[in-house]
Amino acid sequence: MAIKLIVGLRNPGSAYEQTRHNAGAWLVTALAQRHNSHFKIDKKMQAELTEIDINNHPCRLALPLTFMNHSGQTTRIISQFYKIEPGEILIVHDELDLPVGRIKLKTGGGHGGHNGLRDITAQLGTGEFHRLRIGIGHPGHKDLVHQYVLSRPSMHDRQQIYDAIDRGIAIIPIVLSGDMARAMNQVNA
């Protein structure tokens, strides 16, 4: 099934823009820029939206205007309005359980403690959507997670995350075609 909607998870606002938790939005923003596509605020959809077309595969890109914990609301509104099935959605998000700079493509599964994924699963009524997980590393103890994800990465970590974003963007044409197995083999290797 071809992907018709890519959502980059984030917390909106300049205070959060450069934090680890916004790594998903970094990728979606970079993808739009590389295709000379510009986001426009759509209050009805509760998101900044744009469209790209790669090899005759059109796709909407969304950056929620809601905070991370309410990402599902935005995703549900957009998917219902445009009649997009959960299996046609790719959620791009930060991942504590991957080392900094690793990237993995996954279909379905649980939320793994990620509040954005938790809300998307609840709002869509299923976890059967695709996820592109960008490794941000783990602070070492669960009590440090909140502060860690809302902090800015070091220059070294930021560069590793940017490198992962480049690898993620490289597989988007394959993802949009619906060949998830090939995309997974390429990015998860």
Curated annotation (Swiss-Prot):
InterPro entries: Pept_tRNA_hydro, Pept_tRNA_hydro_CS, Pept_tRNA_hydro_sf. The record marks 11 as: Discriminates between blocked and unblocked aminoacyl-tRNA. It holds the Pfam family Pept_tRNA_hydro. The keyword Cytoplasm applies. It catalyses: an N-acyl-L-alpha-aminoacyl-tRNA + H2O = an N-acyl-L-amino acid + a tRNA + H(+). It is an enzyme of class 3 (hydrolase). GO terms for cellular component: cytoplasm. The active site is at 21 (proton acceptor). GO terms for molecular function: peptidyl-tRNA hydrolase activity; tRNA binding. It is found in: Cytoplasm. GO terms for biological process: protein quality control for misfolded or incompletely synthesized proteins; rescue of stalled ribosome. The record marks 94 as: Stabilizes the basic form of H active site to accept a proton. TRNA binds at residues 16, 67, 69, 115. Gene3D superfamilies: Peptidyl-tRNA hydrolase (3.40.50.1470). Keywords: Cytoplasm, Hydrolase, RNA-binding, tRNA-binding. The keyword DNA-binding does not apply. Its EC number is 3.1.1.29. It comes from the Bacteria. Monomer. Hydrolyzes ribosome-free peptidyl-tRNAs (with 1 or more amino acids incorporated), which drop off the ribosome during protein synthesis, or as a result of ribosome stalling. Catalyzes the release of premature peptidyl moieties from peptidyl-tRNA molecules trapped in stalled 50S ribosomal subunits, and thus maintains levels of free tRNAs and 50S ribosomes. Belongs to the PTH family. This is Peptidyl-tRNA hydrolase. It comes from Legionella pneumophila (strain Paris). The gene is pth.
